[in-house]
């Protein structure tokens, strides 16, 4: 066991003494050491309940002959960080979490890990850190939040972001907005739609890293506690079997997860996180081109918020990820999982599917996959749109650019009534390096939707979008403006041509004009010159490479 390096022999007498000071016994030291990686925090609703899950996981470890050690990572709530400088820290926090998991597990000689994340960057961050060690691990995602209800109608967090836009144009009163505020977020769990946190939980299960039904079992469901306990027991078996993550995370496993993502219409942020996770196994193991290639293989089969009417609870009751795998089984390749059964065995074991929620491949919600990669002179290395949440009339759109050099400038313009039908809003210098931190543009996209402009106005950015964004929102434009990308050359009035069916995005300018404009820009001046974000800005790769640190 790896932990023998910490606890075995006379030379480790001081090490054992320190463990005994924590209450561990000689008998405990004969067993596998299992790290319980918790991300409990009192400021994030997705993580407020994780103490209960960590206790259950520890019980499972003890019951099956292991010794658990709990430690914590940070966890940022994207919703609370949204719309201000705090959002610059969200994506960069993924790397801090990965470093923390790697450091703690290696320093203390853990033989295996139970990862307990919920929200957006915490799920990939923990997995990335654990992969660097290549020791057995299992993931217990914290589970979705139930939607709230007011006057017979269901609400969730995105209802409030869009509600701000509705209030601005007089669709609702301030009193009505306050009532929705008080009920929309019903308690513990990740936001109730297929946003980034739940998208990553679904893909974690599809990768084979969580037990079946873990992704969609809700935070307040006792089944989540039982899954945590079972996962604690399972990790001890995995350590004894030496089932390493690289035995599970093959190229085929990643492609399975991408197919599930495309079929469900998950968050565009998955195109950052899946390549970043794969990068811990091998450089460019999975790239944006894999999403592009696989998007031609599956249709969009589930109409889930923000692009549809259903919530995560509906997906769960329809059969969860096993049911999705069952529907896609002709495309899925067989791979190992932490469950002990293969991914296709799990798919074949499904007893019930609600085909009103999880459509058959031959009767999809949309013929095209839920995500689309676009390329052209505006984004030579690619950009991403959640086409499953776009009005069909905006699949193809040509319009004049209105250019803003930050999210804050754009929000002021939108709420100030400066955007009209047909416009293409361009928000730049918000990329991984330029932002820095690649902020999510949920506030401007929600304002556009709330004001009823989502079927006539497009938005493109080198930043990114919340999983809750809907409408013609095209993000991750690469190269970014700070790196001299073409998006930096766009001026007000330039015609932007978008064709989501043909996967193209271009600015109607001659190459000579683009080169001339870029040559006049000079070298990008970093916005932040000290602290973590200053270091991050210098080291981060482009969005098409997963925004990983070089």
Swiss-Prot record:
Gene3D superfamilies: IlvD/EDD C-terminal domain-like
Oligomer and partners: Homodimer.
Positions annotated as active site in the UniProt record: 466 (proton acceptor)
SUPFAM superfamilies xrefs: IlvD/EDD N-terminal domain-like, LeuD/IlvD-like
UniProt xrefs under InterPro entries: Dihydro-acid_dehy_C, DihydroxyA_deHydtase, DiOHA_6PGluconate_deHydtase_CS, ILV_EDD_C, ILV_EDD_N, IlvD/EDD_N
Cofactor(s) for this UniProt protein: [2Fe-2S] cluster; Mg(2+)
Classification via HAMAP family: IlvD
Assigned GO CC terms: cytosol
Protein source organism: Methanococcus maripaludis (strain DSM 14266 / JCM 13030 / NBRC 101832 / S2 / LL)
UniProt-recorded name of the protein: Dihydroxy-acid dehydratase
Keyword terms of this UniProt record: 2Fe-2S, Amino-acid biosynthesis, Branched-chain amino acid biosynthesis, Iron, Iron-sulfur, Lyase, Magnesium, Metal-binding
Keyword Chloroplast among record annotations: no
Function recorded in the entry: Functions in the biosynthesis of branched-chain amino acids. Catalyzes the dehydration of (2R,3R)-2,3-dihydroxy-3-methylpentanoate (2,3-dihydroxy-3-methylvalerate) into 2-oxo-3-methylpentanoate (2-oxo-3-methylvalerate) and of (2R)-2,3-dihydroxy-3-methylbutanoate (2,3-dihydroxyisovalerate) into 2-oxo-3-methylbutanoate (2-oxoisovalerate), the penultimate precursor to L-isoleucine and L-valine, respectively.
Ligand binding (Mg(2+)): 78, 120-121, 440
Cofactor note: Binds 1 [2Fe-2S] cluster per subunit. This cluster acts as a Lewis acid cofactor.
A biological-process GO annotation: isoleucine biosynthetic process
Organism lineage string: Archaea, Methanobacteriati, Methanobacteriota, Methanomada group, Methanococci
Annotated PANTHER family: D-XYLONATE DEHYDRATASE, D-XYLONATE DEHYDRATASE YAGF-RELATED
GO molecular function: 2 iron, 2 sulfur cluster binding; dihydroxy-acid dehydratase activity; magnesium ion binding
């Amino acid at each position: 066991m790896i932990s023998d390096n910490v606890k075995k022999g006379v030379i480790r007498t001081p090490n054992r003494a320190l463990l005994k000071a924590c209450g561990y016994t000689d008998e405990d030291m004969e067993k596998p050491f299992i790290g319980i990686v918790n991300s409990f925090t009192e400021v994030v609703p997705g993580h407020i309940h994780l103490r209960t899950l960590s206790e259950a996981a520890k019980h499972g470890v003890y019951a099956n002959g292991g010794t658990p050690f709990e430690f914590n990572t940070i966890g940022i709530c994207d919703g609370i960080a949204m719309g201000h400088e705090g959002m610059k820290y969200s994506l960069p926090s993924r790397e801090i979490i990965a470093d923390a998991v790697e450091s703690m597990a290696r320093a203390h000689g853990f033989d295996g890990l139970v990862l307990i994340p919920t929200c957006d960057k915490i799920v990939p961050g923990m997995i990335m850190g654990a992969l660097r060690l290549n020791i057995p691990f299992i993931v217990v995602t914290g589970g979705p939040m139930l939607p709230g209800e007011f006057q017979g109608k269901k609400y969730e967090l995105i209802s409030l972001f869009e509600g701000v836009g509705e209030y601005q144009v007089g669709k609702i009163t301030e009193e009505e907005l306050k009532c929705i505020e008080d009920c929309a977020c019903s308690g513990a769990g990740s936001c109730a739609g297929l946003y980034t946190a739940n998208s990553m939980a679904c893909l974690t299960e599809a990768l084979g890293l969580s037990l079946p039904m873990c992704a969609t079992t809700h935070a307040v469901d006792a089944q989540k506690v039982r899954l945590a306990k079972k996962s604690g027991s399972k990790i001890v078996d995995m350590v004894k079997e030496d089932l390493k993550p690289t035995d599970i995370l093959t190229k085929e496993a990643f492609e399975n997860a991408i197919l599930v993502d495309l079929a469900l219409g998950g968050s565009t942020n998955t195109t950052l996180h899946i390549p970043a996770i794969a990068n811990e196994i091998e450089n460019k193991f999975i790239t944006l081109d894999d999403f592009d290639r696989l998007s031609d293989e599956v249709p969009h089969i589930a109409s889930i918020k923000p692009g549809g009417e259903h919530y995560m609870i509906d997906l769960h009751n329809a059969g969860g990820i096993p049911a999705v795998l069952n529907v896609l089984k002709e495309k899925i390749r067989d791979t190992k999982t932490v469950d002990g059964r293969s991914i296709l065995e799990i798919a074949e074991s499904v007893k019930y599917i609600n085909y009103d929620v999880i459509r058959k491949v031959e009767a999809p919600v949309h013929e095209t996959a839920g995500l689309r990669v676009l390329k052209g002179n505006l984004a030579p290395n690619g950009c991403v749109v959640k086409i499953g949440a776009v009005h069909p009339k905006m699949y193809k759109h040509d319009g004049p650019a209105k250019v803003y050099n930050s999210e804050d400038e754009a929000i002021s313009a939108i709420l100030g009534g400066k955007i009209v039908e047909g416009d293409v809003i361009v928000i730049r210098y918000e990329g991984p390096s330029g932002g820095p931190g690649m902020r999510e543009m949920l506030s401007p996209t929600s304002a556009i939707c709330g004001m009823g402009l989502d079927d006539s106005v497009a938005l493109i950015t080198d930043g990114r979008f919340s999983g809750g964004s809907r409408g013609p929102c095209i993000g991750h434009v690469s190269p970014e403006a700070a790196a001299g990308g073409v998006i930096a050359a766009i001026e007000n009035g330039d015609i932007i041509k978008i064709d989501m069916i043909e996967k193209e995005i271009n600015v109607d300018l001659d190459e000579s004009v683009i080169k001339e404009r870029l040559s006049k820009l000079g070298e990008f001046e970093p916005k932040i010159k000290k602290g973590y974000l200053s270091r991050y800005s210098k080291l981060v790769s482009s969005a098409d490479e997963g925004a990983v640190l070089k």
